[in-house]
Amino acid sequence: MDVRTERLNELFFVYHKNLKNQSKSKYSRAVNYLKRRGFNLQDFLKVGGGVGYLQNKEWLNLPLYSFDGNLIGFLNRKVSYKKEFLYTPFNKPPSKSEAFVGLRELVIKDNSIYLVEGDFDWLAFRKAGILNSLPLCGLTISNQQVQWLKQKKIKKIFICFDNDLAGKNGAKNLKEYLTKQGFITKVIEIKAAAKDWNDLFLLNNSNWSAVLTNQLLF
């Protein structure tokens, strides 16, 4: 293990421990933020989530793993009403094109996968038992990610982006690209007045599995 990987693994355990052993006096804003988005502490911990300070602010983070299973960095979400993301370490940011958030938690089913925009959309899918899902953390996919999906024998891809203009246009463009790459591709739009899948989850927290299953029917 090289020095960089060793240091990243050390950071992972520090961030994870910070969240696991959080108290009312420290990192409480991060825990309350998760609750406002419909998630409990275990939802975040079991996917390797953690919390730390960056730029004197609390940031939740998720590990970013390369295709060969190595930890290469973190996706950090600022604990704030305004969405703000950072990739760390700053001195050598990880290449998102050669990795996925949630790679270690992926359970491929029926050679199919659901691609969502954001990390919290992905967590919402997991809450409903949709474990063959990954967050793109954006609207595009890299050639390296496409090749990895092919290596994993993925045949069908369901694109589940946000319910805004950017999400709809992004889904359309991605469908065209993935179809040309040989995948069977379907865009699934949110059939409700919710801006994204996490918001839809918040509106239907008590019967989320049934609601999401119905949304994914086509």
Curated annotation (Swiss-Prot):
SUPFAM superfamilies: DNA primase core. Coiled coil: none annotated. This is Uncharacterized protein MG010. SMART domains: TOPRIM. Transmembrane segments: none annotated. The lineage of its organism: Bacteria, Bacillati, Mycoplasmatota, Mycoplasmoidales, Mycoplasmoidaceae. InterPro entries: DNA_primase-rel, DnaG_primase, TOPRIM_DnaG_bac, TOPRIM_dom. Residues 111-193 form the Toprim domain. It comes from Mycoplasma genitalium (strain ATCC 33530 / DSM 19775 / NCTC 10195 / G37).
